[in-house]
């Protein structure tokens, strides 16, 4: 009888981590930034149907990089958890920290299970507070660990270089246009040190805006409003108004809260 091939637990975990990291690195990067009136999500995404950013609950947003079908399952699970907890207890009992703990348990269990391949995803869960000091941003890598982030965070393919760029330039109290410009500059940087142009139609942008009168603070920035923000900052000035809910081409949340948000179930790496 031949001797079974032995792999140490340490080597097995290292191989699984490397597999997950390579899968995540194939996806496009995204950034999440705090600004004066909330939190902005910015990523390069040519698809108008397969979103990287979504609303989870009133003040909570979700961002993900990696394999689409895997993080979409996690997003739907998060929506169900938040709705059930808010209905059973109170809407204020639904927090980003609680949701991050649920995601961490799920990712950690899958990562350590030899019967399943690790998820090729990296998540960001963000909650906007009534004041900037109350904002919360949590990053969840493939292994289920939780990292409490402040100011800015980048996940996806070129995240290390982008994070360094953001850490050097992000500051408290930025306007939405300033934060958006910084995010686009960071995403435009190439691994070799060069820079490329990302047109507005390839950008996916959303905000958690604490100034919105509605209970639900999540809003997508698209169309003419996105173009105006980019053009305003390029001209060297900053807008004074919060994002309008009536701007043509904008969407407050569309179908983000529904379980059937997309028509595609293919394994799309974004």
Swiss-Prot record:
One example of the protein's molecular function in GO is: threonine-type endopeptidase activity
- Give the record's keywords alphabetically: Cytoplasm, Proteasome
Checking InterPro entries in the record gives:
Ntn_hydrolases_N, Proteasome_alpha, Proteasome_alpha-type, Proteasome_asu_bac, Proteasome_sua/b
Q: How is its activity regulated?
A: The formation of the proteasomal ATPase ARC-20S proteasome complex, likely via the docking of the C-termini of ARC into the intersubunit pockets in the alpha-rings, may trigger opening of the gate for substrate entry. Interconversion between the open-gate and close-gate conformations leads to a dynamic regulation of the 20S proteasome proteolysis activity.
Q: Where is this region: Disordered?
A: 229-270
Gene Ontology BP terms: modification-dependent protein catabolic process; proteasomal protein catabolic process
Which N-terminal stretch is annotated as signal sequence? Answer: none
Functional pathway: Protein degradation; proteasomal Pup-dependent pathway
GO cellular component terms attached to this protein's record: cytoplasm; proteasome core complex, alpha-subunit complex
Concerning PROSITE patterns, the annotation shows: PROTEASOME_ALPHA_2 (PS51475)
Q: Where is the composition biased (Acidic residues)?
A: 244-253
Does Glycoprotein count among this protein's keywords?
no
Q: Where in the cell is it found?
A: Cytoplasm
What's this protein's family per the entry?
Answer: Belongs to the peptidase T1A family.
The subunit field of the Swiss-Prot or TrEMBL record says:
The 20S proteasome core is composed of 14 alpha and 14 beta subunits that assemble into four stacked heptameric rings, resulting in a barrel-shaped structure. The two inner rings, each composed of seven catalytic beta subunits, are sandwiched by two outer rings, each composed of seven alpha subunits. The catalytic chamber with the active sites is on the inside of the barrel. Has a gated structure, the ends of the cylinder being occluded by the N-termini of the alpha-subunits. Is capped by the proteasome-associated ATPase, ARC.
Q: Its biological function?
A: Component of the proteasome core, a large protease complex with broad specificity involved in protein degradation.
PANTHER family linked to this entry: PROTEASOME SUBUNIT ALPHA/BETA
The name under which this protein is listed is: Proteasome subunit alpha
